[in-house]
Curated annotation (Swiss-Prot):
Protein name (database record): Serine incorporator 3
GO cellular component, one term: Golgi membrane
GO terms of molecular function: phospholipid scramblase activity
Functional description taken from the UniProt entry: Restriction factor required to restrict infectivity of gammaretroviruses: acts by inhibiting an early step of viral infection. Impairs the penetration of the viral particle into the cytoplasm. Non-ATP-dependent, non-specific lipid transporter for phosphatidylserine, phosphatidylcholine, and phosphatidylethanolamine. Functions as a scramblase that flips lipids in both directions across the membrane. Phospholipid scrambling results in gammaretroviral surface exposure of phosphatidylserine and loss of membrane asymmetry, which leads to loss of infectivity.
Record's bilayer topology term: Multi-pass membrane protein
Localization per Swiss-Prot or TrEMBL: Cell membrane; Golgi apparatus membrane
Major place of residence: membrane
Length: 472
């Protein structure tokens, strides 16, 4: 009898997989809004896909992947530039990451098209977006399995180009999220400073701003020390110097009287955070430079700095040398983990904030600046305490809280960003017989840093240019 009751109890959860599946999280997050939980579930799916991609780099996976018919037939003798001859055991991991990311990107791009112009949860397509999770996960798995049977060659080269464009787009989205976060942070602290205890909050604001600028200066100094030479690395010298000049310009611009007049909440906190992010993008670009003498690798730099600290005063620590890859093939390095950390923070923040109409409008800079963290506040009808799974509150009957299509497009670009990050932005040839770090990847990243700075400048000057719009 108990077993029968247990079966019926489990059966009550079936609608969560085939209908509005947000009830899967409602037991942990009671009275939560449907708009928030749906985004969290999609983000969790992408996180799972990222974990699967990371597993593909585990030593020994190539043995299993080579069992897939035709998946490794192309690899006879391969070579990673400036490293050593490799077998197909090495590149098969890159190909696996390409296929998994392809499945995720195709799924999210298809949903981006499907969810165009959804206005309320009454739209039948909204039910697909907010539910039917079992079928959507099954679809992703099906596309993943099928993608491993796609012939290589031109697919690999074309997908690399698409991945590079999509990853660059996600870098810009990260900047938009960063600007939004910095503005919200600054506004919150300024409001508290005006409400009471101004000296304390002013000191906190000044301390954090100073910390970001100090870290940026240290970052730039390390880049000059390890990524340039007195008689070489001209491109790196230009990248660092030019971006430093631009960061100084935006910092001065953010406190210009004209800017302050039209946008009083702009300030150095936002500029300091953007400066630090720009230094990160500069380093990320130079870490893909093909010339290994100008790109020593993060592990080599850390080793050199550690040996310099621990070495006796009368000895000199050896200069950093280009890192030698593991004999077993490609693996996740320090650069990968830093890129993944930035990705996780960006996606987590966007899942609860960026995707509202007011926040997605920041992608077009339309000026609305409401906060949607209140979506998680408890209100609406109380859940029945009858043992049935809790249901999320549908807060989108009168209008969606975020742009469904834009959210899926962001996840699509995030999938491509993960693909490029895990594969170190290496470029395959037409037959996937070589993986090389090339200059196009460097220029895509460094150009993204310039576009990011340009976007931030636009957020500052937009109130001066578009005087008929409300940016308050």
């Amino acid at each position: 009898m108990g077993a029968v009751l247990g079966v019926f109890s489990l059966a009550s959860w079936v609608p969560c997989l085939c209908g509005g599946a947000s009830c899967l999280l409602c037991s942990c997050c009671p009275n939560s809004k449907n708009s928030t939980l749906t985004r969290l579930i999609y983000a969790f799916i992408l996180f799972l896909g990222t974990i699967v991609c990371c597993i593909m780099f585990h030593e020994g996976m190539e043995t299993q992947l080579k069992k897939i018919p035709g998946f490794c037939d192309e690899g006879l003798s391969t070579r990673i530039t400036d490293i050593m001859d490799k077998e197909c055991d090495v590149l098969v991991r890159y190909k696996a990451v390409y296929r998994i990311s392809f499945a995720l990107a195709v799924f999210f791009f298809a949903f981006s098209l499907l969810m165009l112009n959804v206005k309320t949860s009454k739209d039948p397509r909204a039910a697909i977006h907010n539910g039917f999770w079992f079928f959507k996960i099954a679809a992703i798995v099906g596309v993943m399995v099928g993608s491993f049977y796609i012939p290589g060659g031109h697919f690999n080269t074309a997908w690399f180009v698409i991945g590079m464009v999509g990853a660059a787009f996600f870098i810009l989205i990260q900047l938009v999220l960063l600007v939004d976060f910095a503005h919200s942070w600054n506004e919150s602290w300024v409001n508290r400073m005006e409400e009471g205890n101004p000296k304390c909050w002013y000191a906190a604001l000044l301390s954090v701003t100073s910390l970001f600028y100090i870290l940026s200066i240290i970052f730039a100094g390390l880049l000059y020390t390890y990524y340039t030479k007195p008689d070489g690395c001209t491109e790196n010298k230009f990248f660092i110097s030019f971006n430093l000049i631009l960061c100084v310009v935006i910092s001065v611009l953010s406190i210009h009287p004209k800017i302050q007049e039209h946008q009083p909440r702009s300030g150095l906190l936002q500029s300091s955070l953007i400066t630090l992010y720009t230094m990160y993008l500069t380093w990320s670009a130079m870490s893909n430079e093909p010339d290994r003498s100008c790109n020593p690798g993060l592990l080599s730099i850390i080793t050199h700095m550690t040996s310099s600290t621990l070495a006796p005063a009368n000895t000199t620590a050896p200069a950093p040398t280009p890192a030698v890859p593991l004999q077993s093939g490609p693996s996740l390095n320090k650069e990968n983990f830093i890129g993944l950390l930035v990705f996780v923070l960006s996606l987590s923040y966007s899942s609860i904030r960026n995707s509202s109409n007011s926040q997605v409008s920041k992608l077009t800079l339309s000026g609305s600046d409401s906060v949607i963290l209140r979506d998680t506040a408890a209100n609406g009808a109380s859940d029945e305490e009858d043992g049935r799974p809790r249901r999320a509150v549908d807060n989108e009957r009168e209008g969606v809280q975020y742009n469904y299509s834009m959210f899926h497009l962001m996840l699509c670009s995030a999938s491509l960003y993960i693909m490029m990050t895990l594969t170190n932005w290496y470029s395959p040839d037409a037959n996937f017989q070589s993986m090389t770090s090339k200059w196009p990847a460097v220029w895509v990243k460094i150009s993204s840093s310039w576009v990011c700075l340009l976007l931030y400048v636009w957020t500052l000057v937009a109130p001066l240019v578009l005087t008929n719009r409300d940016f308050s």
